[in-house]
C-alpha cells in the first residue's frame, strides 16, 4: 500500500506496540503461528470501547445485583517490563463474561492490593484469586492480612490431588493463592481454548484479544511470543484453571 513501507511500520510500532500493529495492520498474522486459540476464532473476535477507563482499568459493564464475580490476578514487579494485571469475570452463569480488566507496568506491588480490593468490593465482594509463584504472594498477603478481605481464595496442597481452591483452609500446606505449576497451566490453557472457541467465555477487550493473537505454543506449553506480553492471557488461564468441564 502506498506510503506503508518499512519506515512507516517502524514508526507505527514505536507509537503503539508490536502486538497492536499486528492486530490492526497484519490481519493475516492471526493464527498464522501455533496460537492457542484457532485462527478462525481469533479473526471473529471484536472489541468494544470501555464505558470507563482510568490508569489501566477498563470497565465494560457495571456490577449487577446478586451476580457472582471473580478477579484473577497476575503480579509483576512494577519496573516497567511485565504488567501487573487482573481480569474481572461474571461467573453467574454460562457464558461467563469478562466485564473489566486492569493492566499497568508501573504499579508497585505494595499499592496494587488496594486497587484489587476496591474493585472487588464494588463487584459484590468478588472472589479474588492471585497467582503466588513470585511477588504475587506479597500482594495476596496484604489482601488477606492488612486489608482483611474475606473473599480471597486460598489453595490447599493435597498431594496427588494437586491444589484445591476454596476458603477456610489452614495449616502449613495452605497458600494464599494458586501456584502456576505445569499442571495448573495445562488445565487452564485447555479450558481457555475450549470455552472461548465454544463461546462459553465472552470478552470484548482490545488488549485481551491482542495478547491472544501472540499467545503461542512453545515446547509443551503456551506463552507470549518474544517481545509480546501475556499478562492478561495468564489471568484468564488462572481463572479457567478453576473450571471443570
Regions found by a protein language model. Give the residues of each.
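Conserved RecA-like P-loop NTPase helicase motor core
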Residues: 173-183, 189, 195
Amino acid at each position: 500500500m502506498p506510503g506503508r513501507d518499512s519506515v512507516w511500520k517502524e514508526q507505527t510500532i514505536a507509537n503503539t506496540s508490536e502486538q497492536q500493529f499486528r492486530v490492526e495492520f497484519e490481519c493475516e498474522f492471526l493464527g498464522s503461528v501455533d496460537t492457542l486459540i484457532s485462527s478462525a476464532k481469533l479473526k471473529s473476535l471484536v472489541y468494544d470501547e470501555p464505558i470507563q477507563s482510568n490508569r489501566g482499568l477498563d470497565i465494560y459493564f457495571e456490577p449487577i445485583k446478586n451476580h457472582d464475580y471473580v478477579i484473577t490476578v497476575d503480579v509483576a514487579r512494577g519496573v516497567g517490563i511485565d504488567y501487573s494485571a487482573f481480569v474481572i469475570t461474571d461467573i453467574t452463569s454460562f457464558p461467563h463474561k469478562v466485564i473489566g480488566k486492569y493492566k499497568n507496568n508501573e504499579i508497585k506491588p505494595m499499592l496494587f492490593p488496594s486497587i484489587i480490593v476496591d474493585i472487588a468490593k464494588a463487584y459484590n465482594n468478588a472472589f479474588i484469586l492471585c497467582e503466588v509463584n513470585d511477588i504475587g504472594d506479597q500482594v495476596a498477603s496484604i489482601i488477606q492480612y492488612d486489608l482483611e478481605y474475606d473473599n480471597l481464595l486460598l489453595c490447599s496442597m493435597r498431594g496427588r490431588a494437586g491444589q484445591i481452591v476454596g476458603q477456610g483452609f489452614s495449616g502449613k500446606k495452605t497458600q494464599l493463592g494458586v501456584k502456576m505449576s505445569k499442571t495448573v497451566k495445562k488445565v487452564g490453557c485447555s479450558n481457555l481454548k475450549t470455552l472461548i472457541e465454544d463461546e462459553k467465555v465472552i470478552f470484548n477487550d482490545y488488549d485481551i484479544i491482542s495478547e491472544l493473537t501472540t499467545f503461542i505454543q512453545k515446547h509443551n506449553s503456551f506463552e507470549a511470543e518474544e517481545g509480546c506480553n501475556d499478562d492478561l492471557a495468564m489471568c484468564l488461564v488462572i481463572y479457567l484453571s478453576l473450571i471443570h468441564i
